[in-house]
């Protein structure tokens, strides 16, 4: 006999969990659509050569790669952005530019499984393709803020940086292995200052003095400074080189745009340690953390990539986007007790006391559905205890009971499972009025 078990880093979703996830995805999808983003889908499985060029060395170690039955070198996608590059290169003639897309799907990384981190997880990506305007970068941050607020989250911060600032810092210190250095810096939260110092020595050959000065710059954060105060503080860096000058100027322009959008200033701050480990980022980058749950890591991250299609097409297309980590958000929202704990989406359970009442019960259920009330019929004529126990377990808000009197008079008795209040022999319209009083959960 086979022992039923799930691989480490993967998980089953019970009905309650699946309902919670579906509700969150529905909310963020509405936000995406409200900004004009349209949905696309790409395969879970791609040619390995499609995915590998833009994967960092750490990500390459985590990719699920194998030979298929046709002896083709294939891999499971590790994010939704690289498949987007392939998709846009293949279809850009019919898409029209600029192109705003969102995609929701599972991705796979063989990283160490831990709280809030899985080897299969869902990403919700939204991207603005075909424009280099910073208006697009500002809109992506606007969508991040709107999406988290749609999930009833208010206490979060979007940490913002620019890859040109990081490139400029590396240039200032004469670091030639820029991508490798930034990949290590991106692990600052995971491995700490000592870990970063050791890896920079080992992988990039830097000495202790250079690393100390490098980390002093990279740890510059806005913190509680106003936008004006912070830009005044870092103005001297513009004189170091063109990369630093351009990066800071872009951030100044971005902040102007975010101010025009009237996004609360406490929701975004500059943090020079934000690097984003993926090699395709070229401009503004950001990571979003929940202020009360920073140990969970970033719940939404992304940035600008101005060479999106370089591996697939001679025509270069710029892009900027972000990815919401819905699985991490579920962990956070669960701990905050902000999730629906029901195991059903039906608001009403209809219970029959006798077999011959089912035809009436089914008509009643259909009438409720046509009125926008999700309903189900308990499939067995039982003593009333069993369907009530079922309703308690599933989380139905109401149980409608059809007994002899209700059947003859074409009424129903209704019990509110939260308050315990029961009303007998109600007309359909009266029952509908009572049930519909709290229909925001539908």
UniProtKB/Swiss-Prot annotation:
Signal peptide: none
Catalysis performed (reactions): tRNA(His) + L-histidine + ATP = L-histidyl-tRNA(His) + AMP + diphosphate + H(+)
GO MF entries: ATP binding; histidine-tRNA ligase activity
Top-rank taxon, per record: Bacteria
One biological process term in Gene Ontology: histidyl-tRNA aminoacylation
Keywords noted in UniProt: Aminoacyl-tRNA synthetase, ATP-binding, Cytoplasm, Ligase, Nucleotide-binding, Protein biosynthesis
Compartments it resides in: Cytoplasm
EC number per UniProt: 6.1.1.21
Gene Ontology cellular-component annotations: cytoplasm
InterPro entries hit by this protein: aa-tRNA-synth_II, aa-tRNA-synth_II/BPL/LPL, Anticodon-bd, Anticodon-bd_dom_sf, His-tRNA-ligase, HisRS-like_core, HisRS/HisZ, HisRS_anticodon
Family to which the UniProt record says this protein belongs: Belongs to the class-II aminoacyl-tRNA synthetase family.
Quaternary assembly: Homodimer.
Protein name: Histidine--tRNA ligase
Taxonomic source organism: Helicobacter pylori (strain ATCC 700392 / 26695) (Campylobacter pylori)
Taxon lineage: Bacteria, Pseudomonadati, Campylobacterota, Epsilonproteobacteria, Campylobacterales
Recorded name of the encoding gene: hisS
């Amino acid at each position: 006999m086979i022992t039923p078990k799930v691989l480490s880093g993967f998980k089953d979703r019970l009905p309650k969990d699946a309902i919670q996830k579906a509700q969150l995805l529905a909310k963020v999808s509405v936000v995406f659509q409200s900004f004009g983003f349209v949905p696309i889908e790409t395969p879970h499985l791609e040619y390995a050569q499609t995915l590998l060029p833009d994967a960092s060395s750490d990500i390459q170690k985590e990719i699920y790669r194998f030979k298929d039955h046709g002896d083709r070198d294939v891999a499971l996608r590790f994010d939704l952005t690289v498949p987007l590059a392939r998709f846009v290169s293949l279809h850009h003639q019919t898409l029209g530019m600029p192109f705003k897309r969102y995609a929701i799907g599972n991705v796979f990384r063989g990283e160490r499984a831990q709280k809030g981190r899985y080897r299969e997880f869902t990403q919700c990506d939204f991207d603005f393709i075909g424009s280099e305007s910073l208006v697009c970068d500002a809109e992506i941050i606007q969508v991040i803020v709107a999406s988290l607020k749609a999930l009833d989250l208010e206490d979060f911060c979007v940490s913002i940086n620019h890859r040109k600032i990081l490139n400029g810092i590396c240039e200032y210190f004469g670091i030639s292995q820029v991508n490798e250095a930034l990949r290590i810096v991106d692990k600052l939260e995971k491995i700490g200052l000592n870990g970063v110092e050791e890896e920079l020595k080992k992988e990039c050959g830097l000495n202790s003095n250079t690393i100390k000065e490098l980390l002093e710059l990279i740890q510059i954060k806005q913190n509680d400074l106003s936008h004006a105060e912070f830009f005044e503080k870092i103005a001297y860096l513009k004189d170091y080189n063109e990369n630093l000058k351009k990066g800071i100027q872009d951030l100044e322009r971005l902040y102007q745009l975010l101010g025009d959008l009237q996004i609360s200033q406490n929701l975004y701050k500059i943090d020079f340690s934000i690097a984003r480990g993926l090699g395709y980022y070229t401009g503004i980058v950001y990571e979003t953390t929940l202020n009360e749950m920073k140990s969970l890591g970033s719940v939404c991250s992304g940035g600008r990539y101005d060479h999106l299609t370089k591996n697939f097409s001679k025509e270069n297309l710029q892009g900027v986007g972000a990815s919401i980590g819905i699985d991490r958000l579920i962990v956070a929202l669960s701990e905050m007790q902000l999730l629906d704990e029901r195991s059903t989406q039906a608001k009403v359970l209809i219970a029959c006391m006798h077999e011959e009442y089912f035809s009436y019960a089914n008509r009643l259920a259909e009438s409720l559905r046509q009125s926008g009330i999700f309903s189900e019929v308990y499939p067995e004529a039982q003593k009333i205890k069993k369907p009530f126990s079922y309703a308690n377990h599933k989380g139905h808000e109401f149980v409608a009971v059809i007994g002899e009197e209700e059947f003859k008079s074409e009424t129903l008795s209704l019990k509110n499972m939260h308050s315990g209040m029961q009303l007998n022999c109600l007309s359909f319209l009266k029952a509908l009025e009572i049930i519909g009083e709290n229909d925001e959960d539908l």
